[in-house]
From Swiss-Prot:
<protein>
    <recommendedName>
        <fullName>Early nodulin-75</fullName>
    </recommendedName>
</protein>
<keyword id="KW-0536">Nodulation</keyword>
<comment type="similarity">
    <text>Belongs to the nodulin 75 family.</text>
</comment>
<feature type="region of interest" description="Disordered">
    <location>
        <begin position="56"/>
        <end position="309"/>
    </location>
</feature>
<feature type="compositionally biased region" description="Pro residues">
    <location>
        <begin position="56"/>
        <end position="67"/>
    </location>
</feature>
<feature type="signal peptide">
    <location>
        <begin position="1"/>
        <end position="25"/>
    </location>
</feature>
<keyword id="KW-0732">Signal</keyword>
<keyword id="KW-0677">Repeat</keyword>
<feature type="compositionally biased region" description="Pro residues">
    <location>
        <begin position="248"/>
        <end position="276"/>
    </location>
</feature>
<dbReference type="InterPro" id="IPR051308">
    <property type="entry name" value="Proline-rich_CW_protein"/>
</dbReference>
<dbReference type="GO" id="GO:0009877">
    <property type="term" value="P:nodulation"/>
</dbReference>
<comment type="function">
    <text>Involved in early stages of root nodule development.</text>
</comment>
<feature type="compositionally biased region" description="Basic and acidic residues">
    <location>
        <begin position="219"/>
        <end position="247"/>
    </location>
</feature>
<feature type="compositionally biased region" description="Pro residues">
    <location>
        <begin position="283"/>
        <end position="302"/>
    </location>
</feature>
<feature type="compositionally biased region" description="Basic and acidic residues">
    <location>
        <begin position="81"/>
        <end position="210"/>
    </location>
</feature>
């Protein structure tokens, strides 16, 4: 509570000091009478004559005559280049329809009889296989309608059973002749019973006689005889050869670029100068009329009244 009271008292004192300082500064004690200062009456000066500022008249440019920019006369009509007249109608590479021919029909696979015609015999001479007579003059890429000839057809041979061999003599397939008097898989006579051995003498089964004493699988110690003195891996001195001396390598000259061919710096072509678009000249507008400032003399002349009262 005391701190709050002290704080409020300090604020009040500061406010009183701030408010009273300008009042005390203006208060001056008057010990004697000071008459008011005598001033000369103000001389009348007429107001200055208003001169409007001089504006130069705008330069008048006559409107340019209209010229269409870079218009060429239309050229005379010329047919487009590289155009050939339409050729007459010709069916490209059309062959006449041939007569009916059975396409690639082979005769039935019938072999001639092996008796009087051995296989792989050529047909008679009057029909050479696969030989066509020399045709008459034919234009290129056009074949005349040939006469009807069945392509690749042999004359019908006599009746031959296809792929039939004559019946061979009777031979039982894969039969061995009967062997001599030894019936297979026959047991021997009774006086020798099969797989019966006579009773052997008494022998202990699988018993070996006691061998002489031998140390079981003992190897002698690996003792090598003392080797003769040999210098370990010493090579004889080679003949005088410079050890691993390579010939001085031939260094190629450093890569040098060839002098570049002089090329003038790339210069852009001068831009096409187009005429400026038609612009209307600006309409002359006179400057707005400004009223001259009215001179109002101060009510107390040139100088303001003194503040000394």
């Amino acid at each position: 509570m005391t701190s709050v009271l002290h704080y409020s008292l300090l604020l009040l004192l500061l406010g009183v000091v701030i408010l009273t300082t300008p009042v005390l500064a203006n208060l001056k004690p008057r010990f004697f009478y000071e008459p008011p200062p005598i001033e000369k009456p103000p001389t009348y000066e007429p107001p200055p004559f208003y001169k409007p500022p001089y504006y130069p008249p705008p330069v008048h440019h006559p409107p340019p005559e209209y010229q269409p920019p870079h218009e060429k006369t239309p050229p005379e009509y010329l047919p487009p280049p590289h155009e050939k007249p339409p050729p007459e109608y010709l069916p490209p590479h059309e062959k006449p329809p041939p007569e009916y021919q059975p396409p690639h029909e082979k005769p039935p696979h019938e072999n001639p009889p092996p008796e009087h015609q051995p296989p792989h015999e050529k047909p008679p001479e009057h029909q050479p296989p696969h030989e066509k007579p020399p045709p008459e003059y034919e234009p290129p890429h056009e074949k005349p309608p040939p006469e009807y000839q069945p392509p690749h057809e042999k004359p019908p041979p006599e009746y031959q059973p296809p792929h039939e061999k004559p019946p061979p003599e009777y031979q039982p397939p894969h039969e061995k002749p009967p062997p001599e008097h030894q019936p297979p898989h026959e047991k021997p006579p009774e006086h020798q019973p099969p797989h019966e051995k006579p009773p052997p003498e008494y022998q202990p089964p699988h018993e070996k006689p006691p061998p002489e004493y031998q140390p079981p699988q003992e190897k002698p110690p690996h003792e090598k005889p003392p080797p003769e003195y040999q210098p370990p891996h010493e090579k004889p001195p080679p003949e005088h050869q410079p050890p691993h001396e390579k010939p001085p390598p031939v260094y190629p000259p450093p890569y040098e670029k060839p002098p570049p061919v002089y090329e003038p710096p790339y210069e852009k072509p001068p831009p096409v100068v187009y005429p400026p678009p038609h612009e209307k000249p600006p309409i002359y507008e006179p400057p707005p009329l400004e009223k001259p400032p009215v001179y109002n003399p101060p009510p107390y002349g040139r100088y303001p009244p003194s503040k000394k009262n």
